[in-house]
Amino acid sequence: KSYYLYMGRLVQDKNPDYLIKAFMQANLADKKLVIAGSNDVMPEYVQYLRELAKESKSIIFTGAVYDRDKDKLLEACLAFCIPSTIEGLSITLLEAMSHGRICIASDIPANKEALGDSGVWCKYEDVDDLASKIIFVATNYDKIAWQEYYNLKRIKERFIWRTVAEQYASYLHRIVAN
């Protein structure tokens, strides 16, 4: 597993620029950063990201990916990175968890709700902290590999539609009973 993965819309709230800066600061010669996503509304922001990354041969922009290509990227990455400032329940984070990936995530409530006791937490909008977490994953992978299993288990217990529907039905039954 030789790369970190960012997957999502390339917009400022999701902070791909902080991730690029942090990855370059981490300076891991044997690792890459794959940026999978696009922004058709603000192409100038994508151009800014490409300019930011142009000094590094280790940062790859794929554009938007779908279906099997998305799965292939998620299956093979060392860690999924979600450095967002503002986020609802991120579908890409749930997808990364369902592939059993370690997740480097900003410590915002939505990410904490999804990951629970898992996750390599970074302070949002803190390039130095994010860089340290990128290095931490590369150098301590064996110590945190348990998170892969935990993330799969958490997805099955909390985010599979059948489970969610059963929990919701139980909740409604309790309300009606009271």
Enumerate the language-model features and the residues they cover.
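A short, well-ordered alpha-helix in the C-terminal region of glycosyltransferases
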Residues: 143-158
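A short hydrophobic beta-strand element within the catalytic core of glycosyltransferases
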Residues: 19, 80-81
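Conserved donor-binding/catalytic core segment of Leloir-type glycosyltransferases
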Residues: 1-14, 19-24, 34
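Nucleotide-activated donor-binding/catalytic signature segment of Leloir-type glycosyltransferases, i.e.
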Residues: 46-68
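Short alpha-helical donor nucleotide-sugar binding micro-motif in glycosyltransferases
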Residues: 64-65, 72-77, 168
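Conserved acidic donor-binding segment of nucleotide-sugar-dependent glycosyltransferases
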Residues: 120-128, 136-141
